[in-house]
Amino acid sequence: MTYHFTEEYDIIVIGAGHAGVEASLAASRMGCKVLLATINIEMLAFMPCNPSIGGSAKGIVVREVDALGGEMAKTIDKTYIQMKMLNTGKGPAVRALRAQADKELYSKEMRKTVENQENLTLRQTMIDEILVEDGKVVGVRTATHQEYAAKAVIVTTGTALRGEIIIGDLKYSSGPNHSLASINLADNLKELGLEIGRFKTGTPPRVKASSINYDVTEIQPGDEVPNHFSYTSRDEDYVKDQVPCWLTYTNGTSHEIIQNNLHRAPMFTGVVKGVGPRYCPSIEDKIVRFADKERHQLFLEPEGRNTEEVYVQGLSTSLPEDVQRDLVHSIKGLENAEMMRTGYAIEYDMVLPHQLRATLETKKISGLFTAGQTNGTSGYEEAAGQGIIAGINAALKIQGKPELILKRSDGYIGVMIDDLVTKGTIEPYRLLTSRAEYRLILRHDNADMRLTEMGREIGLVDDERWARFEIKKNQFDNEMKRLDSIKLKPVKETNAKVEEMGFKPLTDAVTAKEFLRRPEVSYQDVVAFIGPAAEDLDDKIIELIETEIKYEGYISKAMDQVAKMKRMEEKRIPANIDWDDIDSIATEARQKFKLINPETIGQASRISGVNPADISILMVYLEGKNRSISKTLQKSK
């Protein structure tokens, strides 16, 4: 077919949400010429749902994106109105940072970054078609019939693909926040042979701040102790003048209003057909599923410093507007609240992710990548994590360099992508700490130690950032060695000091590291015996040292498991394998292998429905094939 390309790019990214901006920034910073196309330029990196970044598991993803050289962490650190460390009373594996965002300022700040990025063109246009020749991407066609050439295309359309907003019995074509839906592109993806699913998400009503009675709600302040998402942010820039959130609850009257109107709820009348998120259900779904609960938490979250809009977190709904108004007014503190926006549900098309490789390239079409909600995930952070990986791998593919695949032991991003491509998802996927088997080594405090070197190798970590990282790493390594080299002996003077500090006396000589391993002993306690490090260590390095030492036994066991899985991941499965040629594997395993086409024994072992016996049979089969190939090669010599 003959195309009339008016412009040529290395990579075209369709959609400028949180996945799209990370993908386009990563690829352009790696030297590729990139076009970032969006239906509405005013909605770049917009937050159509909750005005926050981070949270359990998600906050760690933001730090991983930052460690790789992404932008989300830097932008939220410039635009937050509140910062809070979650789960501080629990172990280090589940601690995570969460920020309330000034959503308008966040979008503006990210747009400024995109507009000033070399090699990156931002354009408001609607892409209707991805152009493919001989199984390879060659470009795109817009709604205005312009054709742009590209060596790779990344689809990051969020909830816009055949999007439909639902409020009561009203249902109309729309993307998020009442933007245009992308209909023709949704049709095109089907025509290209991709399997498409239909998901649903929702958002709560927004109420006017000045109409809320805060006196009867519970204040939720931010942290005074400085914390940041980005490793480049400085404590002296930490915002002290933070905006609080407020806690209230549903009650018996609220539940009665919902129960009396279930016959008008799209969730229960059949109007909503898409599958909704398990871990962020609508309020009507919660009332039905958890009928024994007397109340549900609601957080009143300001959407910025210069707006009256307040997001009612926990009240996501698609009930009719009049019911929503009664529901809002039944809640303590919101009796006279003015509803500024109505809550709604949105249904949208998504690409079933078992069709993707771990690079986020589709198996069917070379050069076509997908990321974010297009792949069936929920959340800005999950989108950003996929976006940077898709952008990196699209650039590496074009440049003829080895691909980047994050393993489950590398980060939560690796866990998420492996879950998607290996297990698929039948509902909007949300990251949870429980999804990570190595969560003690995938912590909030060590994301830079895990991923900065990768970011440097692919060209996303600049010299200044790398120099700062090397200083931190050297300080950490040197102090760990020092603690392991200095001994505390059970002599009278030492034990007198130990007992004075309230600790059990020493019975044997121990290293400073072994002494610190005691649960009740802090790093500062150890320093009282051995003196400070040669260089001043900041609190974040001290926290990292304490965690690594106190949990060393558990971390060591996790690393042993990682080593075993690495051996499994190194055993490749040929792309052209004939699954029907393998005798004795279970029917379910054969079906799953055909569907997913795992690339390694490790990936095959994680497919649901595949048991250890199937893996053993597969390994015997591959070993037999390898011996057969070796014999053939020897005969031909």
UniProtKB/Swiss-Prot annotation:
Q: Which InterPro entries match?
A: FAD/NAD-bd_sf, GIDA_C_N, MnmG, MnmG-rel, MnmG-rel_CS, MnmG_C, MnmG_C_subdom, MnmG_C_subdom_sf
- Which annotated residues bind FAD? G15, A16, G17, H18, A19, G20, I127, S182, Q373
| Entry's Gene Ontology cellular component terms | cytosol
Q: What keywords does the record list, in alphabetical order?
A: Cytoplasm, FAD, Flavoprotein, NAD, tRNA processing
**Residue sites binding NAD(+) per the record:** 276-290
Q: Kindly list the cofactors needed.
A: FAD
Where mainly located? cytoplasm
The cellular location(s) given in this protein's UniProt record come to: Cytoplasm
Its BP terms in the Gene Ontology are: tRNA methylation; tRNA wobble uridine modification
One Gene Ontology term of the molecular function aspect = flavin adenine dinucleotide binding
Record-linked NCBIfam families: mnmG_gidA
Q: Which family does it belong to?
A: Belongs to the MnmG family.
Q: What's this protein's function?
A: NAD-binding protein involved in the addition of a carboxymethylaminomethyl (cmnm) group at the wobble position (U34) of certain tRNAs, forming tRNA-cmnm(5)s(2)U34.
Assembly and interaction partners: Homodimer. Heterotetramer of two MnmE and two MnmG subunits.
**Under what name is this protein listed?**
tRNA uridine 5-carboxymethylaminomethyl modification enzyme MnmG
User: Which organism was this protein described from?
Assistant: Streptococcus pneumoniae serotype 4 (strain ATCC BAA-334 / TIGR4)
Name the gene.
mnmG
